[in-house]
Design a protein with these regions (language model features):
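Short glycine/proline-centered loop/turn elements that form peptide/ligand docking sites
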Residues: 28-35, 55, 133-140, 193-194
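Amphipathic alpha-helical packing segments from all-alpha helical-bundle domains
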Residues: 87-88, 108-135, 139-154, 171
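Helix-turn-helix
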Residues: 23-57, 61
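Short Lys/Arg-rich basic patches
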Residues: 1-7
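Hydrophobic alpha-helical connector segments
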Residues: 73-107, 111
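Alpha-helical structural segments
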Residues: 11-22, 40, 57-80, 117-121
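C-terminal peripheral helix-coil segments that are non-catalytic and often amphipathic
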Residues: 128-131, 161-207
Length: 207
């Protein structure tokens, strides 16, 4: 099969991911179909299957492109979720749309399957930041990773991604996320996870 053309506009994956979030904002994940996706994106089915094996594969790619791996790096360096440096990160161009898409992934139209994809992505980012694999963790460390990732997703799920809409003011979206970032339990949890993974990395180096 020949490679799909790119005439200088958004690539097929970019169009498919944009269509995915548009559909997911109005349709439960289990009701999103390949036919609806390719129609919304303006591509053909061959183009979809050139890039992805199925809807879950697209969801993983979309999640990878949305989750802010930079936050794990900043927190690992000793900062808190509410720090000025993290605030500056959220105010970079395009960040509000990434946040809006993240809220869609964890919102009312998500499912246990999709939340699992998001949770695994969050966990993989934290593990990669410390040079770890899941098998490097002790049971209590793995439990901490699961707990903090799940808690962060639970907090995000409380924010309605449609409160501003796709064309709404990004400042409101960022203000809502700033409120979440200032919650003390999130600060404590993020610091605890960073310390836990730091200990796991030190133990791995000593083995």
């Amino acid at each position: 099969m020949g490679r799909p053309r790119n005439d200088g506009g958004p690539t097929a994956p970019q169009r498919l991911e944009a269509a995915f979030f548009d559909l997911l904002s109005a349709t439960p994940y289990q009701d999103v179909t390949i036919s609806a996706l390719v129609r919304e994106a303006g591509v053909n089915r061959n183009s979809f299957y050139y890039h992805y094996t199925d809807l879950d594969d697209l969801a993983r790619s979309a999640t990878d492109n949305v989750v802010l791996s930079e936050i794990a790096h900043l927190i690992a360096s000793g900062l808190t979720p509410a720090s000025e440096q993290v605030d500056q990160l959220f105010r970079l161009p395009g960040m509000a749309e990434r946040v809006r898409r993240m809220l869609i992934l964890t919102g009312a139209h998500s499912t246990a399957r999709l939340r699992g994809i998001v949770r695994e992505t969050l966990q993989d980012i934290w593990l990669a930041e410390f040079g770890l694999e899941r098998e490097d963790l002790e049971p209590q460390e793995e439990a901490a990773l699961d707990f903090i990732a799940g808690g962060a997703m639970a907090l995000l799920s409380r924010v309605d991604p449609n409160i501003t809409g796709k064309e709404g003011p990004p400042e409101l979206t960022l203000e809502l996320i700033a409120e979440i970032r200032s919650i003390p339990v999130l600060t404590v949890g993020a610091r605890f996870l960073a310390d836990t993974l730091q200990e796991a990395r030190a133990r791995k180096r000593d083995e």
